[in-house]
UniProtKB/Swiss-Prot annotation:
Belongs to the small heat shock protein (HSP20) family. It comes from the Eukaryota. CDD domains: ACD_sHsps-like. This is Small heat shock protein hspG6. Coiled coil: none annotated. It holds the Pfam family HSP20. The keyword Ligase does not apply. Keywords: Stress response.
Length: 210
């Protein structure tokens, strides 16, 4: 019969003290989605007389960005820790998205000038006007970026962001667990997963002969 020590031993062997290098080894690049795992959140696993408790630290992460599933006896906790933007950065993002959507809508609408352009050949002066306008727009965008860079001065940058993923192999004790009783709670950056144990369980299945 597997014990909680078997799980912890497997957990420690797989994660190797949560080193970042081992994170890349244990959580390789997903070939289909090209996702790189940047973080390996710390985890505590506790087995009581009636339940299995899994606690994972996910500080600074919204619950909407966390995914939990069990597949082939493997519990997977994954998601993304996104960087928060300040008010100035948020305003720039909104302005850029608004300006791009406005330009797209204008391009979709036919104008009288477009019909005239189809009839009349374009002159060199028209081409010069278009290129001048494009150059001016590019300069304005660069000036906005330079303003943002000049106002943001970071003295210390120790926080990490990006995708995270954590595995827990439940193969040795899965027969003891009632998967229909899984309960999750996310509070103050701590994700707690509780799985009740079955009242009656056995790792041996008796087969009758007909």
């Amino acid at each position: 019969m597997a014990t909680i020590f078997d799980i912890l031993n497997t957990l420690n062997n797989n994660n190797n003290n949560n080193n970042f290098e081992n994170c890349k080894r244990q959580c390789p690049i997903n070939k289909s989605n090209k996702t790189i795992i940047d973080k390996l959140p710390p985890m505590d696993v506790t087995m009581t007389n009636d339940k299995l408790i899994i606690e994972t630290e996910l500080a600074g992460i919204s619950k909407d960005h966390i995914e939990i599933d069990i597949k082939d006896s493997i519990l997977t906790i994954q998601g993304e820790k996104k960087k928060n933007l300040n008010k100035q950065q948020q305003q720039l993002v909104i302005e850029k998205s608004t300006s791009s959507s406005t330009l797209d809508s204008k391009e979709d609408e036919p104008s009288i000038e477009e019909f005239e352009d189809d009839i009349k050949p374009k002159s060199k002066s028209d081409n010069t006007t278009v290129s001048t306008t494009t150059t001016a727009t590019t300069k304005e965008n660069k000036e906005d970026e330079n303003k943002t860079k000049s106002t943001d001065k970071k003295f210390i940058s120790e926080r990490s962001f990006g995708n995270f993923k954590r595995y827990l192999d439940l193969t040795k004790i899965l027969y003891q667990l009632d998967l229909n009783s899984i309960n999750t709670q996310f509070e103050n950056g701590l994700l707690t997963i509780t799985i009740n144990k079955k009242l009656h369980y056995s790792n041996t299945i008796k087969i009758n002969i007909n």
